[in-house]
Design a protein with these regions (language model features):
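Short Gly/Pro-enriched turn/cap motifs at secondary-structure boundaries
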Residues: 66-68, 97
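Short, charged/polar surface micro-motifs in flexible loops or helix N-caps
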Residues: 46-50, 56-59, 82-84
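Vicinal oxygen chelate
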Residues: 30, 42, 87-129
Length: 129
C-alpha cells in the first residue's frame, strides 16, 4: 500500500525553525545534509519524516520555487513499490516532472499545482519514539 511518509517545509531560518519544532512539539533531529542546492534537516515525531529545506540564495533550480517563492509547505512524499512504474502513471495523468531527469526521489507537480514526490520503500527510516 502506498502512503505518505514525508513532508518538507521550505524555510528561511533553519536553526530557529528547528528549535521551534523541537521545543514546542518534541521532534527529534535525524540528520542534516547538503543536497544539491539546499541544506535538508530531517526531524521526526517517530512516525513521519519532517524535513526543513534551506535553499542556497543563488540557486535557480526548478525545485526551489516550485511550491512558492517564500517559506511554504514545499512538498510531500508518497512511498511506492516501483518508482519507475509510478512515474509512468503520474505522467499519464498529466503531471509535470519538476526534478532533474534521473533523480530519485521524483518530484512532480500534481493536478491543481501541489508539489509531491515519489520515493522508494524505506527511503525515510524513522527513529521510533
Amino acid at each position: 500500500m502506498n502512503r505518505i511518509v514525508h513532508l518538507a517545509l521550505k524555510v528561511e531560518d533553519l536553526e530557529a525553525t528547528t528549535r521551534f519544532y523541537q521545543e514546542v512539539f518534541g521532534f527529534r533531529e535525524v540528520e542534516t545534509k547538503k543536497v544539491r542546492d539546499h541544506t535538508s534537516r530531517h526531524l521526526t515525531d517517530g512516525y513521519i519524516d519532517f524535513a526543513l529545506l534551506k535553499y542556497d540564495p543563488a540557486s535557480d533550480s526548478k525545485e526551489k520555487n516550485a511550491a512558492g517563492k517564500g517559506p511554504c509547505i514545499h512538498h510531500f512524499a508518497v512511498e511506492v513499490d516501483d518508482v519507475e512504474a509510478a512515474t509512468r502513471q503520474i505522467l499519464a495523468h498529466g503531471c509535470t516532472i519538476v526534478s532533474d531527469p534521473g533523480v530519485v526521489p521524483v518530484k512532480f507537480q500534481a493536478p491543481g499545482g501541489t508539489i509531491a514526490e515519489l520515493v522508494p520503500k524505506e527511503r525515510y527510516k524513522k527513529q521510533a519514539g
